[in-house]
Amino acid sequence: MTVMAPRTLLLLLSGALVLTETWAGSHSMRYFSTAVSRPGREEPRYIEVGYVDDTQFVRFDSDAASPRMEPRAQWVEKEGREYWEEETQRAKAFAQTFRVNLQTALGYYNQSEAGSHTIQMMSGCDLGPDGRLLRGYDQHAYDGKDYISLNEDLRSWTAADVAAQITQRKWEAANEAERTRAYLEGTCVEWLHRYLENGKETLQRAEPPKTHVTHHPVSDHEATLRCWALGFYPAEITLTWQRDGEDQTQDMELVETRPTGNGTFQKWAAVVVLSGEEHRYTCHVQHEGLPEPLTLRWEPPSQPTIPIMGIVAILAILGAVVTGAVVTAVMWRKKSSDKKGGSYSQAARSDSAQGSDVSLTACKV
């Protein structure tokens, strides 16, 4: 597999940034690149997306009508025309490098061109609360399996199999680790600082989760308690169930944090409990947007505020009022009938059998 495109292809800052600002917490920048070969077509599809923390900010797709690096966040749109031109050219160069790497990998693994194959890469950097590099990443995969990755020292590689060892030897001979380290410690950190400043209203906000617990009967003797956290940012959150103060991590069902589509996230954790023991379980929520961790319990539905006997009494009173009204109407009509004669009296008796329509019929004289 040939040497990957130099990491210095990212647009460099025109001037050095002073790394003295203190951030609310740790932050990260990641680029995820994927190339998929397609039998019968010369060019594989290449897709690249960039993230700052949990926010996608750029995207490139070689299958687009006019392939270009495109903004996915408002705060990056303020970058000038030169930025987008350089980023587009860099992505296109990576697409060609990945195309060559796919062909090379076929030889390494003795595979034919009849099938579809995939190369993936993730590169990026983490900043600590002090704004300095916490960790750098450069990881590669082939057909969904680890291939080669840069070690935490940013000076050496770990190859996952014999084929990857060929790449490792090539990269060591070309001092690829040194160039990658220079990008991670320099360009990556500088651009992440720039993005955090330009998008601080979005990237450095902390929206606390909206939380509640739901109850779902499983059988006559068991129920599921589900602890919900909705609408929070950033995505990092901890949900834990406890029984009488002891963690129930082994017995929990926990879903991965999911985007809600509006820039926030959601997550839930569930535990199965014996019916009648729900009060022994508490859900504990920790998130950057909370002033302190939350403790939640399932609260059974409250009893009706009006007692049953009160409802019965009200219904009885209403019944008496309606009955009295009907009796009064009938007596009034009988009295009117006696005054006006026989033929109308017969009509009145006939109408009286229509119940609540009596008064309406009486008006049709």
Swiss-Prot record:
The modification Phosphoserine is found at residues 356, 359. Residues 25-114 are annotated as: Alpha-1. The chain crosses the membrane at residues 309-332. It is found in: Membrane. Residues 346-359 have a biased composition (Polar residues). One of its GO terms (cellular component) is recycling endosome membrane. The keyword Nucleotide-binding does not apply. GO terms for biological process: antigen processing and presentation of endogenous peptide antigen via MHC class I via ER pathway, TAP-independent; antigen processing and presentation of endogenous peptide antigen via MHC class Ib; immune response; positive regulation of T cell mediated cytotoxicity. This is Class I histocompatibility antigen, B alpha chain. It comes from Saguinus oedipus.
